[in-house]
UniProtKB/Swiss-Prot annotation:
InterPro entries associated with the record: ApoA_E (IPR000074), Apolipoprotein_A1/A4/E (IPR050163)
GO terms for cellular component: chylomicron; extracellular vesicle; high-density lipoprotein particle; low-density lipoprotein particle; very-low-density lipoprotein particle
One of the Pfam families matching this protein, by short name: Apolipoprotein
Keyword annotations of the record: Cholesterol metabolism, Glycoprotein, HDL, Lipid metabolism, Lipid transport, Lipoprotein, Oxidation, Palmitate, Phosphoprotein, Repeat, Secreted, Signal, Steroid metabolism, Sterol metabolism, Transport
Subunit comment: Homodimer. Interacts with APOA1BP and CLU. Component of a sperm activating protein complex (SPAP), consisting of APOA1, an immunoglobulin heavy chain, an immunoglobulin light chain and albumin. Interacts with NDRG1. Interacts with SCGB3A2. Interacts with NAXE and YJEFN3.
Region (10 X approximate tandem repeats): 67-264
SUPFAM superfamilies for the chain: Apolipoprotein A-I (SSF58113)
Principal place of residence: secreted
Subcellular location: Secreted
Annotated protein name in UniProt: Apolipoprotein A-I
């Protein structure tokens, strides 16, 4: 269980919260990401499954067995859509409680991130300024060459390209130097952030908060399982008529084949 909690901590650090921290966009909750992916996946499965069922029904085997699977497909799709909706509410409730219980952990880690960001920001600003200066210097050197191209003849194009080559290489070389400088500065703070994270997780492992959360997590899982059980039972009951219809069609077809064989 401790490993689960530590993994969750890293998830929140490197997932939507960290993305929001660096990119400053609106964070998407972990549950929203899971739900969006699951919805997309199920929709694709339903659509492709319906096409496959239609092909199977139209096949010689499907006609001989009188499967009529396509007639039951809407029933199946409706049952699974209902299951997804009902489990969605239960899962959302579970996830909301989980995020509430781990808010203290995310808050502490965000504080650590903010400290590191303040140290790193000057280097990012400096890198941006240097790159702007390099681009400005490059444009200043290229501008006279552009005038030559505009005023010169077509045969001068090759000469212009030869002049632009070294300038482009010069800009690239300077950019790489600045990137190396930035990478060197950031490496120190990346290691510092890793050490802070390790210390933070170590402190959490030794604190009573972890034991309390283990108890809460177990309670949440039991509650989720209890609420999901009747929903899954409803799905099973809803699929019974489809299964019985399928079994009946198979049995009738088998009886007809047996009768045909014995009469010959």
């Amino acid at each position: 269980m401790k490993a689960v909690v530590l993994a969750v901590a890293v998830l929140f650090l490197t997932g939507s919260q960290a993305r929001h921290f660096w990119q400053r966009d609106e964070p998407q909750t972990s549950w929203d990401r899971v739900k969006d992916f699951a919805t997309m996946y199920v929709d694709v499965i339903q659509e492709s499954g319906k096409d496959y069922v239609a092909q199977l029904d139209a096949s010689t085997l499907g006609k001989q067995l009188n499967l009529n699977l396509l007639e039951n497909w809407d029933t199946l799709s409706s049952a699974f859509s209902k299951l997804r909706e009902q489990l969605g509410h239960v899962s959302q409730e579970f996830w909301d409680t989980f995020e509430k219980d781990t808010a203290w952990l995310r808050e502490e880690m965000n504080k650590d991130l903010e400290k590191v960001k303040k140290k790193v920001q000057p280097f990012l600003d400096s890198f941006q300024e240097k790159m702007q200066e390099e681009v400005k210097r490059y444009r200043h050197k290229v501008e006279p060459l552009s005038l030559e191209l505009r005023d010169g003849a077509h045969q001068q194009l090759k000469e212009l390209q030869e002049k632009l080559g070294p300038l482009g290489k010069d800009l690239k070389d300077h950019a790489l130097v600045h990137m190396d400088e930035l990478r060197s500065h950031l490496r120190t703070y990346t290691e510092e952030m890793g050490q802070i994270l390790a210390e933070r997780l170590g402190a959490i492992k030794e604190s009573t908060s972890l034991a309390e959360y283990q108890t809460k997590a177990s309670e949440h899982l039991r509650t989720f399982s209890k609420k999901a059980k009747p929903i899954l039972e409803d799905l099973r009951q809803g699929l019974l008529p489809v299964a019985e219809n399928f079994k009946t069609n198979i049995k009738n077809t088998f009886d007809q084949i047996t009768k045909h064989v014995t009469t010959q």
